């Protein structure tokens, strides 16, 4: 069993190190890693990209296992073997393990994104001799802006939740008022049927039962009147304004000057443009390599065709030689017979 696992792992390691695996996997990572950030929050786009990566890896592995003759059970047993969990092999098999482990996949994509950004910055520095001003300032203002916006959103959600709870209390109080009214009406009808002469007692009991309900309903009625006067957009603006006042945070976008905003935009556009140039150069180099391989294949095919033609000509020469031999032998026999 151990020897089978070692053989399967050796085959998979050789395949993972080859160009059939590395070229499509690296190309996928370079094109899809730009949206991955080193944050705790997982975006919805991460899941879609992970599913696409699963399909790619499963297709490549299935083709290799079918060519080598390894079954799916043997591959699973080899992955579960202790040898596959060693530190060295685990690092090499990281792209394969990322299919089932989303944390490994995210860390791998974040690392590739950082590598491409550093590569783009290095190329900029080599061309210009120095980095531009938009890439030299220290603190990242964008992350601070995102944190402040998240605080505002969470505060607005908290206020909307409180408003929703107040609305629910108002509705429950209204329902209780209706039930008490119906209950008092039934009591009045029952009392009038039993004692028609005594008509003052049900009215007094009805007033006594309605008094505490009216006291509870008054604050909710005021709140509901305010809610009716305000539209949905005004209510949302009021919640955000209240959140800013309570948290002591003003809008982060308004805190920035026009020069800082333009500098942030220049920085993002500059990096994006350099990144696209780098990817375009890589694509051109891959196309050139592919074209050279196609030319080599055509050359080898032409050589094979030439060798086949030579074989045919040799075969014809042999047939002619055989015919000449037969004619010579027949001539000699006829001469001896005469």
Swiss-Prot record:
Q: Which residues form a coiled coil?
A: 142-179, 255-330
- Keyword Cytoplasm applies: yes
Give the similarity note.
Belongs to the CFAP36 family.
Q: What broad taxonomic lineage does this protein's source fall under?
A: Eukaryota, Metazoa, Chordata, Craniata, Vertebrata
Protein name per its UniProtKB record: Cilia- and flagella-associated protein 36
Gene Ontology CC annotations of this record: axoneme; ciliary base; motile cilium; nucleus
* Annotated segments matching region Disordered: 175-220, 281-314
Its domain of life?
Eukaryota
């Amino acid at each position: 069993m151990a020897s089978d696992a070692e053989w399967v792992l050796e085959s998979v390691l050789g395949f993972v190190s080859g160009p059939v695996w590395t070229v499509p996997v690296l190309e996928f990572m370079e094109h899809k890693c730009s949206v991955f950030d080193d944050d705790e929050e997982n975006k919805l786009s991460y899941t879609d990209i992970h599913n696409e990566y699963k399909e790619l890896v499963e297709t490549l592995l299935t083709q290799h296992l079918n060519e080598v003759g390894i079954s799916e059970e043997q591959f699973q047993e080899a992955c579960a073997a202790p040898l596959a969990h060693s530190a060295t092999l685990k690092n090499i098999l990281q792209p394969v393990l990322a299919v089932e482990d989303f944390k490994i996949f995210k860390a791998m994509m974040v690392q590739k994104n950082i590598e491409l950004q550093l590569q783009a910055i290095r190329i900029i520095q080599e061309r210009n001799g120095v980095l531009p001003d938009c890439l030299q300032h220290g603190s990242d203002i964008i992350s601070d802006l995102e944190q402040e916006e998240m605080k505002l959103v969470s505060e607005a959600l908290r206020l909307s939740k409180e408003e929703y709870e107040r609305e629910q209390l108002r509705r429950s109080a209204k329902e209780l008022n209706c039930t008490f009214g119906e209950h008092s009406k039934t009591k009045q009808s029952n009392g009038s049927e039993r004692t028609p002469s005594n008509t003052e007692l049900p009215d007094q009991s009805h007033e006594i039962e309605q008094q505490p309900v009216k006291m509870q309903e008054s604050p909710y009625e005021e709140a509901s009147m305010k809610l009716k006067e305000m539209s949905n957009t005004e209510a949302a603006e009021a919640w955000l304004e209240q959140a800013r006042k309570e948290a002591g945070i003003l809008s982060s976008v308004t805190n920035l000057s026009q020069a800082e905003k333009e500098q942030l935009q220049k920085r993002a556009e500059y990096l994006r443009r350099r990144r696209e140039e780098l990817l375009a150069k890589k694509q051109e180099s891959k196309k050139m390599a592919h074209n050279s391989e196609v030319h080599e294949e055509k050359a080898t095919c032409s050589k094979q065709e030439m060798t086949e033609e030579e074989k045919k000509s040799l075969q014809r020469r042999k047939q002619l030689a055989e015919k000449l031999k037969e004619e010579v032998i027949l001539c000699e026999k006829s001469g001896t017979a005469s």
